[in-house]
C-alpha cells in the first residue's frame, strides 16, 4: 500500500478543477440530450444516430452528476464516503457509466463505418443492411464484459479492503490488491490511498482495450474505403470532394478525435496504476483523476462540433446569448 499526504491547498485546487469539469460535462451532455429530445418531440421520430447520441449523452450526464454527488459528500460529510456500501455503490456507478460511455461511442463509430463505407464483400453488405441490429448486438455482447468487469472488481474488493465503520481508516491485508483510488479526510490532512495491482491491471486493460480495438478497426476500414473511393473518382475523372468523400472525411474526423482521446485516457490509466512503482509522485495520480473526467467531456464537445444539427443549435444559442447580453447592456442605466 502507498500512502501520500496531500496538502489541503492541493485538495481545494483539485476539487475546483473537478467542479469545472463536471459543470462542463453537465452543460455539454445536457445540451446534446435536450436538442435531440426536443427534435424528437417535434418530428415524432428520431434517427438511429440521434438515438445513440442521446443515450450516450444521458449516460455521461448520469456519470457527471454521480461525480458531483461524490465530491459534495467528500466536502460535506467525509465520514459518509468511508462506508463500505457508499464506496461499493460509487464504484459500480463509475464502472457501469464508464462502460456504456465507451461502448456507445464505439457503436457510434461502427454505425458511421457501416453506413458510409463502400465494400462489395458479402459479409459487409449483410452487416450494412442490418446496421441497427449490429449496433444492438454490440450493446448486448458488451453486457457480458460489464458483468465480468463488475464481478472481478467485487472479488478484489472482498479480498483487498476491510472498512471499519465509524473509524476513518482502512485495514489492509499483507497481500492487498486494491484496484481503486480513493480520497478521504483524517483530521487536518487528506490522504490518497492507492495500490498497484499487477493482477488487476491486465484484466482492466482488457475490458478497456476491447472497444478501443473495435473502434480502431472500424477507423482503418473507413480509411481504406475512402482510399478506394478516391481511386474510383480519379478513374472516372470526377472531383475528389463529392458527397461520399465529404461523409468519409467527417466520419474520420470524429473517429480520429475519439481514438486520440481514448488512447490518452488509456495511457493515463496505466500511468496512474504504475506511477507509484516508478515515480511515487502524487501529481500523476491527480492528473489521472482529472483525465478520467476530461475524456467523456472532451468527446461530447467533439460530437457537438461534428454534428450539423448540434452545431447549428449551438450557434443559435450563442447568438441568443449575445443578443441578450447586448439588450441588458442597453437597458442598463
From Swiss-Prot:
Residue spans, topological domain Extracellular: 1-14, 82-90, 156-205, 275-283
CDD domains: 7tm_TAS2R14-like
Bilayer disposition of the protein: Multi-pass membrane protein
Tissue: Expressed in subsets of taste receptor cells of the tongue and palate epithelium and exclusively in gustducin-positive cells. Expressed in 15% taste bud cells in circumvallate and foliate papillae but only in 2% in fungiform papillae.
Glycoprotein recorded as keyword: yes
Keyword NADP in record: no
Highest rank taxon of the organism: Eukaryota
Gene Ontology BP annotations: detection of chemical stimulus involved in sensory perception of bitter taste
Sequence ranges on the Cytoplasmic membrane side: 36-60, 112-134, 227-253, 305-333
Gene3D superfamilies: Rhodopsin 7-helix transmembrane proteins
Pfam family membership, one: TAS2R
List of glycosylated residues: 167, 186, 195
Any one of the GO CC terms: membrane
Keywords noted in UniProt: G-protein coupled receptor, Glycoprotein, Membrane, Receptor, Sensory transduction, Taste, Transducer, Transmembrane, Transmembrane helix
Family: Belongs to the G-protein coupled receptor T2R family.
UniProt miscellaneous comment: Several bitter taste receptors are expressed in a single taste receptor cell.
Known function: Gustducin-coupled receptor implicated in the perception of bitter compounds in the oral cavity and the gastrointestinal tract. Signals through PLCB2 and the calcium-regulated cation channel TRPM5.
The protein, known as: Taste receptor type 2 member 110
Lineage per the UniProt record: Eukaryota, Metazoa, Chordata, Craniata, Vertebrata
